[in-house]
């Protein structure tokens, strides 16, 4: 597992690229309070290397000079900051019924977002023009695109399996890169939520589970600050875990899956995904209380299993489920206490402060990290 908040010094084979990432990360985290001398001290790089890289990034529009720092007996140092004005990364959330697309600054601030109805069977034909339209509306240059998908994204960057999209070994990233002309990077939707939660966290090495509940159900696991994806990148595929609490038929064809009891359409009693409802409106009234109680028992059973297995105590619910109000959380907490009173005081469950936007932010964060080495911290909630 690679820490999501640590970038080490380079090995000889990739010295320049890694040193650029190291410098840019420290400048970004400094938020206008670091000078070239500070970067030398923080990174351990020599003065000539830092001066050369800063000059290069100033010319490219990635870094800017923002003023003078306090003098310590000599010439005041020139302070540096990430230049957040010229570039954007795009985040895309892919669902069964359509897409959400957002343009974000290099600090993770959402500049523009929109929803697009589309058939997942024709992903590229719908998504490519939508991305091109968003890009054309901006006065910034697109560096890269991050796409969150409901399925396993393997080490090759392929969708190795997605029940909801009915795809196996699908090179969506390669297809989009070819048609768009931008680098495109894929990430599992629950892993994207987990990345966003790490960026929000005050803890430099948090341990948590981001449980995405939308068309499907999945978990993103962060252990001591590192995203855990497993040997074949399938860690967190809990939607088709059979907890033996019901016999409902799942989209995968089996019965008893967590997803069959807890996906958003079951919780609301609505056949269509909540992803396509108007934004900015609370929808507590859509929560089906009977279904919510049943889903809560299944979710509580999962939280208990994860706690007992790997000692993850904090769970953050992400995705469309965040719009369902406090009722579902209360049912989950009650179920935890009923199962084992001890657990009620040791397992915490809450909605993400990012709401729906966590998946988009995590997808865009993936693009920013892959292209520039930036690890977002203190993103806006």
Regions found by a protein language model. Give the residues of each.
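Acidic-glycine-rich active-site phosphate/pyrophosphate-binding loop
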Residues: 173-174, 228-230, 235-243, 333-343
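Glycine-rich phosphate-binding loop of actin/hexokinase-like ATP-binding domains
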Residues: 205-261
